Amino acid sequence: METIAQLQSKLQEAADLLASVTRELDAHRNAGAAAESFDFARLRCDAENHPYTGHPAARSSMPELYYLLLLTVLTTAEAKEAQWLHLYRITKGADYAQDVHDLLPAAHAMTDAQMVECIECIRRDNLTRAFLIDAMILTLLREEEDTYLLEYIAGLAALMEVPPAEITEVIQLAKCVASQDSERYIEFLGKSSIEHAKETAFYFHQMTDDLNSAVHHNTKHLIIANVSKRNTQINLDEWKANRISFVMCDFENMTFKSNQKHVDFLGCTFKKVYHMCCISINNGTIKDCVFDDCKADAKSPVIRLSNVEISNTEFTHCITEDADANCLFEVDQTTMTGCRFTYCIRKGGASSDAGIVQATNNSILQNCIFECCSTDDRDPLSISMSSIIWTTSRKKAPTSSILLLHNSIVKNVTFQSCTGEKTQQMS
């Protein structure tokens, strides 16, 4: 247990930090107060047409406190119109009925006690990251460096006990949003946690949750987020966008094909795709996805990937019973990292060498796990007859394996409770 002296020391540190934050805020305010000349009615109208739908502030137990503390970022000389528009888009997206501008006098008069109350509410509602992202975006939208403001936000982050690594991520995300750099944003998600998308995808004007209209979006990079769809076959080469990113979508009996576009799937689920190729793309990324209950045949593996980075993705209960099917998962010039295959089964023998995963042309499989996977569940009579036929013809009988490789590399791949041959090279 902590001693009274230790507790007193912590309280003093918190008091000193709060005083420092307040001084930064006061210094910021004392820079001067230019008269506002913005058309707030127009800003509210613009925000209603382009709200940040799904903003996490909607779950705040006391939204006034969230916006009150956020407004302290604007209690400075010459707040920018872009900052106010961002704030209005937050409130509209979070279904806040009041005019946030009415809270501005209270933000100017913020006391230490009120600041502590705001911070405690934000932390209690698990909105710390969302708040800091909004605060940093507002800072960046000033389009000029403001040392006082950055120090103020750093002080708030310290009071909220946010670790330095998380602050770094917040800054990176905020920079992507402020510059509307969607490609950099998707690359960031690919290297970090897809969970970040839940609190940030709605910020991008290139984002849509309407799959039916997505084909007509004439933009360099289109983000489709939080979509649930079933029973549709989509040729992405028919879409106008050059790059297409699906984020946190749920698909059932859906197929996606593209030979020309860069396509990303992040945090998506695919299920019940039978005798059709679920994803066939020639360039892109797949991360944190799940493929469940899919069936392959000779013409259609579950996935057919070329020049793709696929990572941290799970394949469960995917099977084929077609002897002419070369594989369930076909990858070419592709890197597969940290993926897990569970109860993926190849039944029915093989008319040629076959595998669960077929990797060709300098593909890399690394740090993957195969659990309870199996190949070639033929009955003994079928096996005996097949052996006689191939022995008579003096050719090597085709075999099934979990991995079927050609000019490809396997690193640290684990097989747990699997049956059948583990690895073979393509002839």
Annotate each predicted stretch with a short phrase:
Residues 1-75, 79-207:
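Small-residue-enriched hydrophobic alpha-helices in membranes
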Residues 5, 9, 16, 23, ...:
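Intrinsic-disorder/low-complexity peptide segments enriched for small residues
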Residues 201, 221, 226, 231-233, ...:
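Detector for repetitive beta-architecture
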Residues 206-213, 228-237, 248-257, 271-280, ...:
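Extracellular beta-strand/beta-solenoid scaffold signature
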Residues 216:
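Cyclic nucleotide-binding regulatory domains
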